[in-house]
């Protein structure tokens, strides 16, 4: 079995990412003797830092954030964009990986709901967010829909139940609808928000990827992008809320159009690691790309010793201004 030396850098381990136990490592371990070390031949990196610039080896980028890969810095990438770039790119949404994979698998073959399940719902709609830096449309919709009925807000942002919830899905399950708005709207960018709303047995009210209908059946949720205004979205939600038969029909519509396993990830990684090492490089080695990396490495020092701290203070002040809970 071929031995490969890899390392993960610039990932946000605070969000539950496990360096030695994740879909990437598990996929590679099927075919290779994987060593995670500090002198790698290959690195996997994400958007939470610039440490990847220290490694002049094969670079494989992954993002769970709304960020298009820079193919001048990476040899290969996995992300949200619906694009084709030879063997250098794989579209791999966040909800198919890490701790979110369980919710995705849960809704692939979920049992049908009945009217008794609908009758158990004790709340109208939920809103679970701690990020107050998203596009304003999310907060605006919360306020507009709240004029119709109370929305249970269980995150740190706009919390109205006395504190953040410990179990998000259990909290969501009590309500009929979930406000599943991404931080921003961008073609291809869809995260765990819609998947967790389905997994909790609710009807998502979704905003984010204008092309979401390519991945999920719009008969199973309210797609904000299908309506001319937020007022029209609210009218549709009211219609569903007042028609239990229609609501149950939406609950029982299979949400995922083309359920996917990890075989595409396996094939993508095998193509990279089965090659001779020197032939696996893809990124340009021009004077321009080299100069840009030098510039970013200099910026990295400013980020490490200055900008990181000023941004933290600024963001804390914004959270306080917007009423976001800073602790449980």
Show the residue positions of the predicted features.
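Pol beta-like nucleotidyltransferase catalytic core
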Residues: 2-61, 67-152, 161-180, 187-328
């Amino acid at each position: 079995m071929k031995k490969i030396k890899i390392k993960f850098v610039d990932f946000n381990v605070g969000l539950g990412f496990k360096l030695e136990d994740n879909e990437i490592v598990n996929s590679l371990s099927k075919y290779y003797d994987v060593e995670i070390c500090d002198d790698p031949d290959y690195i996997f990196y994400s958007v939470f830092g610039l440490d990847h610039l220290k490694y002049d080896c094969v670079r494989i980028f992954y993002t769970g954030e709304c960020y298009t890969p820079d193919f001048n810095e990476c040899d290969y990438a996995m992300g949200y964009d619906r694009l084709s770039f030879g063997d250098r790119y794989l579209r791999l949404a966040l909800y198919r990986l890490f701790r979110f994979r369980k919710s995705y698998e849960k809704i692939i073959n979920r049992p049908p709901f009945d009217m008794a399940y609908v009758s158990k719902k004790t709340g109208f709609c939920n809103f679970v967010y701690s990020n107050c830096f998203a596009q304003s449309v999310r907060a605006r919709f919360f306020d507009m829909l709240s004029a119709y009925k109370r929305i249970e807000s269980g995150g740190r942002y706009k919390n109205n139940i006395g504190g953040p919830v410990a179990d998000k899905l259990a909290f969501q399950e009590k309500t009929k609808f979930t406000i599943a708005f991404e931080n921003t709207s961008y073609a291809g960018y869809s995260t765990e928000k819609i998947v967790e709303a389905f997994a909790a047995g609710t009807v998502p009210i979704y905003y984010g990827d204008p092309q979401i209908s390519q991945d999920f059946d719009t008969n199973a949720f309210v797609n904000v992008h299908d309506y001319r205004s937020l007022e029209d979205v609210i009218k549709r939600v009211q219609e569903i809320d007042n028609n239990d038969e229609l609501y149950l029909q939406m609950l029982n519509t299979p949400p995922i159009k083309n359920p996917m396993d990890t075989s595409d990830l396996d094939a993508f990684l095998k193509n990279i690691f089965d090659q001779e090492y020197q032939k696996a490089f893809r990124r340009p080695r021009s004077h321009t790309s080299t100069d840009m990396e030098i510039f970013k490495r200099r910026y990295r020092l400013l980020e490490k010793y200055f900008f990181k701290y000023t941004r933290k203070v600024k963001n804390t002040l914004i959270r306080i201004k917007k009423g976001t809970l800073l602790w449980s």
